């Protein structure tokens, strides 16, 4: 008799996705981040659900409701910090997942890659709106500054910003709608993840060599289920270390001060995972130019497949591209550091140089390096 997992309509889908899935035998730990992102999403949805049971999205009570969660709700402090630091782990995994995709040429799976970019935008939007909800100083001023950027759009900008705010400033209406969107978006993300996986399973996974692996596939279970389980343990360990020993390490002390529209904090900055984009935004003195650069810093990912000039898919055997890739990583770390610094000399210049370098590497230097490597192949 055939196993039920191969015949049952629902179990059959799970079987083809997680059990009998033919997987390349040589995929490294860099391929663990997909499942880790799935785990992060589950953690965020569950902790978020329990937080939403106690949170109130009203300007008068939002801050005190978060305080109430931390002080009076059973293990509320744990749920709150798991959620806040879970977002940080989410972005660490996201950036590593995208970096893996660039390094090993996974972007040649166009549908999977493009849905991944949409997912990245959706997760960033969710995280931004979530940061507004505790209604601390950085919540309020972060929301004011970032939403205000839309006013740079010609003709419709001001009307658009006031429409998003639901008034003439960030206020009760803004907080309520941000809570509504913050609640619904993770479920939209979960649906997009399914589509992301659907397209991935149409082609099968890439592998470090970038060479088709049809001749050497192994079943996902038990080989990669056990490998993913190890990744889960490492992620949970790191998250718990962060939550239980220094829960506020990645947060901003200003967010422990209730929102006050009459008092601007000296340095308005977003959470650490947005600092690289914030640095790119600030490096351009023009408002509209800065907004375009900010959007392009992520949208540039969509252009990468069009600029693939190499005869090899992966960077595994391409030393010049490898050097450029790691320079890009160092550049992103530099931008992250600059984003958290005040707007003064020498940080302004460093930020501008790092921003130019970021776009230059992706749009000019990497395609050129690939062409040079193609020539070297013929020697």
Swiss-Prot record:
The cytochrome bc1 complex contains 11 subunits: 3 respiratory subunits (MT-CYB, CYC1 and UQCRFS1), 2 core proteins (UQCRC1 and UQCRC2) and 6 low-molecular weight proteins (UQCRH/QCR6, UQCRB/QCR7, UQCRQ/QCR8, UQCR10/QCR9, UQCR11/QCR10 and a cleavage product of UQCRFS1). This cytochrome bc1 complex then forms a dimer. It is a multi-pass membrane protein. It comes from Sylvilagus audubonii (Desert cottontail rabbit). A ubiquinone binds at residue 201. Its main location: mitochondrion. It comes from the Eukaryota. This is Cytochrome b. Binds 2 heme b groups non-covalently. Its cofactor is heme b. The keyword Transmembrane helix applies. Keywords: Electron transport, Heme, Iron, Membrane, Metal-binding, Mitochondrion, Mitochondrion inner membrane, Respiratory chain, Transmembrane, Transmembrane helix, Transport, Ubiquinone.
């Amino acid at each position: 008799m055939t196993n039920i997992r191969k015949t049952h309509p629902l179990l059959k889908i799970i079987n083809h996705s997680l059990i009998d899935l033919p997987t390349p035998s040589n995929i490294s730990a860099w391929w663990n981040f997909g499942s880790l992102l799935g785990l992060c999403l589950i953690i965020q949805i569950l902790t978020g659900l329990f937080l939403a049971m106690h949170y109130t999205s009203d300007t008068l009570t939002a801050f005190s409701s978060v305080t109430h969660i931390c002080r009076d709700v059973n293990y509320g402090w744990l749920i709150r910090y798991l959620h806040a630091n879970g977002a940080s782990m989410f972005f660490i995994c996201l950036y590593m997942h995208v970096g893996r995709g660039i390094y090993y040429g996974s972007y040649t799976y166009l549908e999977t890659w493009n849905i991944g970019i949409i997912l990245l935008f959706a997760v960033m939007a969710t995280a931004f709106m979530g940061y507004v909800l505790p209604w601390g100083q950085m919540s309020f001023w972060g929301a004011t500054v970032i939403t205000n950027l839309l006013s740079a759009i010609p003709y419709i900008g001001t009307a658009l910003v006031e429409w998003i705010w639901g008034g003439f400033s960030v206020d009760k209406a803004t907080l309520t709608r941000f809570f509504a969107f913050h609640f619904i978006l993770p479920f939209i993300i979960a649906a997009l993840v399914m589509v992301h996986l659907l397209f991935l399973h149409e082609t099968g996974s890439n592998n470090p060599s970038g060479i088709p692996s049809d001749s050497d596939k192994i079943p996902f279970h038990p080989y990669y289920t056990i490998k993913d389980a190890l990744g889960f343990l490492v992620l949970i360990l790191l998250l718990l270390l962060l939550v239980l020993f220094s829960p506020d390490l990645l947060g901003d002390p200003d967010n422990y001060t209730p929102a006050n529209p009459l008092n601007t904090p000296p340095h308005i900055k977003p959470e650490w995972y947005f600092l690289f984009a914030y640095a790119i935004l600030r490096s351009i003195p023009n408002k509209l130019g800065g907004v375009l650069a900010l959007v392009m810093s992520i949208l540039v990912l969509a252009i990468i497949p069009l600029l693939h000039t190499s005869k090899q898919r992966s960077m595994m055997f391409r030393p010049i591209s490898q050097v450029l890739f790691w320079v890009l990583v160092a550049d992103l770390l530099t931008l992250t550091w600059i984003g958290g610094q005040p707007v003064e000399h020498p940080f302004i210049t460093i930020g501008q140089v790092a921003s130019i370098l970021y776009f230059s590497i992706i749009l000019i230097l990497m395609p050129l390096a690939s062409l040079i490597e193609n020539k070297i192949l013929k020697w």
